[in-house]
């Protein structure tokens, strides 16, 4: 037996329900320096962000002026942050772990000691949505990585990420051992890469501003997560409202040759009163 508690209230699509707006504004977001995560040692994470007292984002911060960079932070996660700690168990506390220096941001959603896999969370050398190389553009007004705390981890954005992007999924996968094949269930947390976060939010902002009827061309390279971007966009379009609180779309139809999209839509579970299903012809 158990009792389900709602520990966070998310931003409603419109202001028509004042109670929903009040509950959203009552969320308490915190920032803790040198966050102690264990009762077995005195190790700390440089910074932890919490929502209503629950730690959800971990950041290890390094800077080149002291001879350290994001690689040092990644090694710290791999070697000094035991995956056996309760706070680091998948889907228990932290949802994402960032390794940050003055020029680059990398992230992972699951600590697995030396097997931890980090991915870049950078804008690209010429900025978001502009063709370029790896890394981030120079920032004349601050650090090259300041977009992380000035934009991505800003209050509304962080709650939006938790609400509409981050997903805990279970996938069946075939494993062959000693010539014997069997299906196993693997769990993982899905967190958008920066280009996915950026394109979905830009699309939604333009739709709210201009309504239906516009065409958009989105450039995605191979292996960049097109299916997830489509799924996130489809779910959000199904519930988007204009400035007057009116729903913009009655239905969302996705036409694609990506046969995996049906499973992607099922995996990207968003806590919205919408249901999407793929149909084939």
What residues fall within each predicted segment?
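ATP-dependent helicase/translocase motor core
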Residues: 1-251, 260, 264-271
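Conserved SAM-binding loop
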Residues: 254
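Single conserved hydrophobic/aromatic residue that forms the stacking wall/gate
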Residues: 268-281
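Conserved H-loop
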Residues: 257
